């Protein structure tokens, strides 16, 4: 039943609360990073760009969270960003504090606008898939599939997702959720995508 509840839920705050025990902090941090990336105008302010890059390194264990201590309070970040604390600015805080990504993500989502909440819902599904329907990707980890997944992860260019679907089918994948996710032309893919992560063995 919980899997169906996840599929129906439209409130990102409720999706966050539904995440099972032991969920991936790495994935949650990538969710936050992508939310910030989508809401801050480009080019990012220098502070935002620096913090965002650091947060992504922390997510993949390429940096230590202590390296982000130079921004430590909500008030300081609000002053740095120069705007109110809705949506993207709240999420930027999550990146800088980093000690409890789950609590800080809740704090931020509670302050998101309705449109930001809708986008957060979409991103949570892109990154976590349906965490109550576990899929074993091991049988489909051919050299071709893994190479495609790794290339997209490293480059952030997910244009090869339909090609990945073909490679997965060649490897024997007949899971409609996986194949449809790869081939959906309306789906925006980001680093942390549940299919790409599954193939790369990332949690």
Q: Residue spans of the language-model regions?
A:
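Structured binding/interaction patches within domain cores
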Residues: 1-203
């Amino acid at each position: 039943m919980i899997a169906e509840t996840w599929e129906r839920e439209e409130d990102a705050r409720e999706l966050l609360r539904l995440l099972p025990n032991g969920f991936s902090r790495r994935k949650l941090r990538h969710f936050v990073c992508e939310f910030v990336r989508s809401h801050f105008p480009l080019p990012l302010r220098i502070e935002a760009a620096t913090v965002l890059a650091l947060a992504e390194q922390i997510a993949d264990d390429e940096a230590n969270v202590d390296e982000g201590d130079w921004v430590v309070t909500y008030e300081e970040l609000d002053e740095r960003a120069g705007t109110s604390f809705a949506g993207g600015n709240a999420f930027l805080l999550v990146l800088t504090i980093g000690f409890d990504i789950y609590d800080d993500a809740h704090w931020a989502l509670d302050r998101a606008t309705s449109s930001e909440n809708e986008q957060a819902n979409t991103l949570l599904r892109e990154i976590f898939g349906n965490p109550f329907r576990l899929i074993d990707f091991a049988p489909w980890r051919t050299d071709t599939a893994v190479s495609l997944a790794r290339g997209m992860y490293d480059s952030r260019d997910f244009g090869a997702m339909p090609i990945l679907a073909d490679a997965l089918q060649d490897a024997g994948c007949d899971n409609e959720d996986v194949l449809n996710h790869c081939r959906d032309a309306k789906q925006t893919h980001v680093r942390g995508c549940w299919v790409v992560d599954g193939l790369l063995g990332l949690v």
